[in-house]
Amino acid sequence: MTERVLLVDDEEEFLEIMAERMRVRDMEVTTSTSASEALELIAAESYDAVIMDFQMPEMDGIQALKAIREKKPEMQIILLTGHATVEKGVEAMKAGAMDFVEKPADLDALSEKIKKAHHQKAVIVQKQSQDKVIEMLQKYGM
């Protein structure tokens, strides 16, 4: 199954190169140059993973991650950074990121993380569906 990915970065050249490299690997990639546009896309579409730059002008990756978590807690988010530190990694994970990748991203490693995100999202969605069925059965005394 093809993974659907939203790639968010304010550096357009990086965005275009990464998107093309991901498409060559049969991923369906949508791109966005801002966190606010990404939030609109996430509200309207379904993605297996969001890969987002840690530092963007209007809203950073952590702020965007928190906004996404409020609306779509099942969304798998991988943050990208050009300045990886242990502190940034810890901050990203505490905020709810699935993972954290240093730029320039190793596409093999990133592809594996995206596959993992696809699987994790499917498990979460399945559990949510099961929880709804159980809730309905309990509601009607079954």
PLM region spans:
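Two-component/phosphorelay signaling modules centered on CheY-like receiver
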Residues: E12-T30
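Helix N-cap/capping motif at the beta->alpha junctions
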Residues: T31-E40, G61
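Short amphipathic alpha-helix used as the core "switch/output" element in two-component signaling
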Residues: E40, I62-P73
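Receiver (REC) domain active-site loop signature in two-component systems and cognate sites
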Residues: M56
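C-terminal output helix
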Residues: A105-K115
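CheY-like receiver
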Residues: H119-M142
